[in-house]
């Protein structure tokens, strides 16, 4: 029986990589250096090892699959979607619950998004696995991240 070896690489994206300064490109719009949004310690070295594995042993792999985290600019899990009840910004790593939205502590910036946002929060909470976490903008479709 022939052996099947499938490599799965999960979200190997710039926004998750602790890139050394020399690997970070210049932002053509601002002239500043682009920074990863959510760097994971050791990820750059991990991906260098994955690249070496593929280089040296790729012929022995049956398949390679790669997942990507991808978000639109306006995403329910990003600060750009939300505001606090007083109108101020919601900071990354804020957890938002449906009851807080119903009480007016947090609101979508677009009032027309309220019913859908509440339905989503209710579904998350009913499933009992997650509460909504507001993440820094990351892995935006079409961006360097």
Where are each of the predicted segments found?
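Active-site acidic carboxylates
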Residues: 1-145
